[in-house]
Amino acid sequence: MQAYFDQLDRVRYEGPQSTNPLAFRHYNPDELVLGKRMEDHLRFAACYWHTFCWNGADMFGVGAFNRPWQQPGEALELAKRKADVAFEFFHKLNVPFYCFHDVDVSPEGASLKEYKNNFAQMVDVLAAKQEQSGVKLLWGTANCFTNPRYGAGAATNPDPEVFSCAATQVVTAMNATHKLGGENYVLWGGREGYETLLNTDLRQEREQIGRFMQMVVEHKHKMGFQGTLLIEPKPQEPTKHQYDYDVATVYGFLKQFGLEKEIKVNIEANHATLAGHSFHHEIATAIALGIFGSVDANRGDAQLGWDTDQFPISVEENALVMYEILKAGGFTTGGLNFDAKVRRQSTDKYDLFYGHIGAMDTMALSLKIAARMVEDGELGQQILKGQLSLGKLAQYAEQHHLAPVHQSGHQELLENLVNRYLFDK
């Protein structure tokens, strides 16, 4: 089979002085950072959907890309052609993982029976590709938001037949993820929210999605899946308001339904922006609450109110993110998935590489800066030890006539310190 990316053998590390746009300047997979290989710290993944499914269409224009697998033809054969190109890309980019939605890799078909048959065939194709390439599945998920039947939600839909269709997709995608050795399974409620409260029963919808998640957990244990279940927070789009608004909201939901020990979060940078938070805030909050799982590494635009899904380029932002992750012990089953897409005007097929290479270098440099912060310990925080009751603390304060003086937070000093790590050689 002829290679699609025929002008490239493989992206390799050439060092900071390289001017080759198809080489890494900072990402050296085997470089040791805090005693661990850089590849093992970062656990990079490329996503199927933006990279191979999006045809360049937007709200104001038709598809701008000329991808061979997006032309008219027999659906399964085109899906297999897409898989050929995808794994060629993963191998040449040198990423250890990939991620997918069910209908990214397989034709949906005209019925649930067709959906399951098509997906089963494509899972076999993907398994062979993984075996051949050594690329592994970071996580799988089900697309329960694109089909018109999910217009009023999937797990929150008031129609039990729609709810059942969503359950079918999720159980099938979970089984596929398990078979392919996936390390996580993601649940993103793209339409689990509302457009107006005039036709929405908030209590019922919350109870429905709570029960749905409980069933997902039950199925995980029944099938023996050892990976991590992840919810991906997002405040809005496509709905006006989504129930998984941000990390703190998801934690409250998990606590309500007794799931806080079973499900963690997959945090996307652009979703943090839409929620009015920094990416740093969402990561730190998840770690503090004990539900940090994985990351969708991208960036949004603070001036725009929608998901732009651009590649990350800010070392300043991501060094602080990687600092939080390193302090917490690093990833376990999670990783850095690039939920990002080239711009509509980027029609050259090698633009896919340019976007990912820049993003991987950004995260690699961020990791190295974060490691220096951890090693130096200047940004370390005191760890509370021991336990005292509120009454004993009050008694202590009275006996010792405490009159503490306000201590400076030194924000400016700390910001300057971060800049030293970022910009000093």
UniProtKB/Swiss-Prot annotation:
Its main location: cytoplasm. Its EC number is 5.3.1.5. InterPro entries: Xyl_isomerase-like_sf, Xylose_isom_bac, Xylose_isomerase. Transmembrane segments: none annotated. It is found in: Cytoplasm. The active site is at H101, D104. GO terms for cellular component: cytoplasm. The keyword Isomerase applies. It comes from the Bacteria. It catalyses: alpha-D-xylose = alpha-D-xylulofuranose. GO terms for biological process: D-xylose metabolic process. One of its GO terms (molecular function) is xylose isomerase activity. Mg(2+) 2 binds at E268, H271, D307, D309. Binds 2 magnesium ions per subunit. HAMAP family: Xylose_isom_A. Belongs to the xylose isomerase family. This is Xylose isomerase. It comes from Salmonella paratyphi A (strain ATCC 9150 / SARB42). The lineage of its organism: Bacteria, Pseudomonadati, Pseudomonadota, Gammaproteobacteria, Enterobacterales. The gene is xylA.
